[in-house]
Amino acid sequence: TGVYHLTLLHFLCDKFETFIFNPLVTNCNKNVDIRKVKNDKKDSIKIAKIGKFQDVKCSSSFDIEIYTLKSLCRDYYKITDSKSTFKKKLSTDLRVIFPGYITVFSNITCKTSMAILKEFSSPESILNADKDYLINLISSNSKKGLVHSEAIYKKLISASEDAVYICINSPSLFVKITNTLSIIENFEIQLANLLKEINFLMKSNRIPDNFKQNVALIYSIP
């Protein structure tokens, strides 16, 4: 099993010498019969026979901190994948609601783009916005100066003028943009929290030095 054995293992390790079999090994061996029988008692006997009569690899160590680190890393990459899914959704929705917007920014979820979409989620709202305010919004988020901000502003206005004529103009559709932005921002907060805890755990004395050395060795690979 994936996780169901962990609490039992943690309990037994205190008093007994305990070993873990890879579930792929036990599953392969219990499926040798012609008829597939799902029975906990029979499965337990088959697993016990594997341990007694077969030479299979097993593990006898369980480090709580290493398990914690692996669990945090898995969550980090799962949330990263989920964030990518919603970034694709945002791109798809913008092609319908705000065509041409994706040509303004190379990354539509960068800080500047997110700030604009949160405040001006439709082409009309951008065209009606105060020029100085919009340029200042771009400048304060991009940190790249006035010349760059004015160039982005011109591209944004041009894309908005085109989008007014070709977009599917329904105010109710804009809620899809704001909802997706909120979800992406929430994912970014979760990722930052996980990364902070992962770094804290790696720098602590709770992780064995040899494990840290192995991680450093992997990082050294070009």
Predicted segment positions?
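A detector of single, family-specific signature residues
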Residues: 1-222
